[in-house]
Amino acid sequence: SFLSCREQDGAQLLSRITQKEVKCVLDPTLLLSAKEWGKYCEFEIPKEPYILVYFLGEKSEHRRAVEKIQKLTNWKIISLPAAYLEMENNDYKKVWGGPKEFLSLIRGAALICTDSFHGTMFSINFQRNFFSFCKSSDSEESSENSRLYSALNIFGLSNRIIHNMDNLTAEDISIDYKNVIPILEEQRRD
């Protein structure tokens, strides 16, 4: 029998419990290419650059981080309201929708700010600039952060997790995907 897990910590735990090798594998959302997911992107998106905000949690410091990024870029903010955080300025738009809107907005965003694991994975798949935020503290028993850390470490993108906004500059926004894509393709083959 074959055992696999989406995160390194989980794979190690299962391996200790079962005394079997447990392989760390890609999240299923990454098994399809951006082109394949693109078939579902039928929602019309804005022409000008925008920051897509998709937060499942309700941390006010995340809101403040997005506002700082918005000031650095002057890009409009579009929010997919899961647990919507009201922005202090009026330079945003809420968008309600389903999977097509979600995928279209991620694919078209200049930058994604999210605390969603899958928001992060789709950002990588569509080769978008993104910042990931942790929904909970690493010390919380219900923390899901290890899954995010594990995935970002595989792609060499652990620097995309925002812990401290103090030194963030506009140059920190861009991601060079030239080293990420070969890793993603190799992981798909595995």
Please report, for each region that a protein language model flagged, where it lies by residue:
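Active-site anion-handling motifs in enzyme catalytic cores
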Residues: 1-190
